[in-house]
Amino acid sequence: MPKDGVKYYSFGSDGSGENNEEVIKNDRKRRRAFVLWSPDAKYFVIQRSDSRKVKDLWVINSVSAGRPTLETYKYQMPGEAEAPKDEVWLFDFAAKTGKKLNVAAFKDQSLNTYSKPALNSDRDNEFRPALWLGDNNKFYMGRTSRDLKRIDICVVDVKSGTIKPVIEERFNTYVEVQRPGLVNGGKELIHWSERDGWGHFYLFDENGKLKNQITKGSFHCEDIVNIDEKARVLYFTANGREAKEDPYYYHLYRVNFDGSGLKLLNAGDFDHAASMNDEAKYVVDNFSRVNTVPKSVLLDNLGNKVMDLETADLSLLMTTGYKFPEPFKVKADDGVTDIYGVMYKPFN
């Protein structure tokens, strides 16, 4: 790796988040650089950002131990010309060579190199390799315009270093983006988009041609939980679909890649946090509301309950006189929109 990194133009990390005392204490310490490796560990990619011309901003921590401390960091205020300049570098580990990729598309753009989703079975492993999203020959990254209205999902060829936009989003409003889901190593991509006014998933081929919209309707899809490539089923979380529920409550769903067979897996008027095994066979569903005892159950991938797992014991809490808050729903001033809230009353 080149040794020309300097403060605010360094590889992988610029030291942001340190106060004035920590800057002095850590001046000679080696810093961890965030890199993403190819699956065969022959290459790695790292981002570099040049913020040297960006003006300083400050935060004073007045509640630190002893004297207040000062944190200085780079921040572009609205209307200022100088912006951070993001770069992506690709390195050949054996050859000890690297090159800056030509990622230019938008003025003052921001970049995001996507990592491979972690396996749930690796959750408790002390060492978990940081791999890029892709394979030994390619990886995926995103670039976003400064005004947040243009986004490219790109694929990078490792050998040539060329960058190809696969999916492009162009709107007159703020655009959000998520890491794409790869099917069969990138032969197909599952892309999250708000192009129809709601957050939904879309199926693209490897060249960026839209095959079909997977989910649709007046609800918000949140995250990809699992992709069953063989069965061509997508498991995902969403909210706002179930009638007469708080629209902020999350649920787990399954749907076929062609958009058919949409099914709610963890029914119940609760906020759900679901964890699925890597083989997409079973789900641990934790659920509760602010006025209920948290519970967890084991489900299969069709939503059938296999067994009860745990119910939280709040008996000691209740002996203190604790009372659950009370959820409520009222109409907004327009007389149509429901507003959800929680009322906390004194215990006495």
Regions found by a protein language model. Give the residues of each.
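A short beta-strand motif characteristic of beta-propeller blades
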Residues: 23-24, 99, 117-120, 164-168, ...
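Non-catalytic accessory segments flanking enzyme active sites
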Residues: 45-48, 54-55, 81-87, 101, ...
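Short consensus segments that form the blades of beta-propeller domains
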Residues: 25, 76-82, 120, 142-146, ...
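Short loop/turn segments that connect beta-strands within beta-propeller blades
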Residues: 93-96, 158-161, 205-209, 256-260, ...
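Signature of short aromatic-glycine-proline-rich micro-motifs recurring in repeat-based ectodomains
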Residues: 14-39, 115-132, 178-187, 191
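Predominantly five- to eight-bladed beta-propeller fold
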Residues: 2-36, 43-114, 302-317
